[in-house]
Amino acid sequence: MQKKMTKNIFNWNHVSEKLTEDQISELKALYKFYHKKYWLFKMTYKYFKKAELTCNIGSVLLIVTGTVVGGVTLNPAVLGSVSGAGLLLKTYSEIKNYKRKIEMSKFAYTSYAKVLTDLRSFMRGLNYNEKEYLDYVKVLDELIIDMGCPLTDKFEKRYNKVFIQ
């Protein structure tokens, strides 16, 4: 049986000679930390997109099926029960507030993608001001937490399987 290979997140093709070893190790640690946040929020975004799509398609199918079958059979019980189930599914989707969760997850993962791009640029030689940049990412983290972005704990095991093992 073949051992599954893990993916390497450090895919830089150039590291600037201007950086000290301490700066390189710090940038790699930051990259590792924010790559995990990026990946977890991206998976959360995909999960909520699929959940919303499933609820919407399911509710439409139930409502249309109930309406057609109820109209053909002239049986109001079928119309009410099947269409009612579709309306319940639509209500469930609205109560779960998937649209907001999708927006928040997308904001979080695109923000962290920008952080990863910045860190790669610093590794390639862009001027790196440690204090200024750490203040920036701290404010970004606090903003994402304050906005109430959905938790990403359910994907952490998969991240560890893909990138860490």
Model-identified regions with their sequence ranges:
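Conserved non-transmembrane functional hotspots
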Residues: 2-61, 91-165
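Membrane-interfacial hairpin junctions
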Residues: 68-78
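Membrane-active amphipathic alpha-helices enriched in small hydrophobic residues
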Residues: 54-68, 81-88
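Amphipathic alpha-helical interface surfaces
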Residues: 77-80, 84, 88, 108, ...
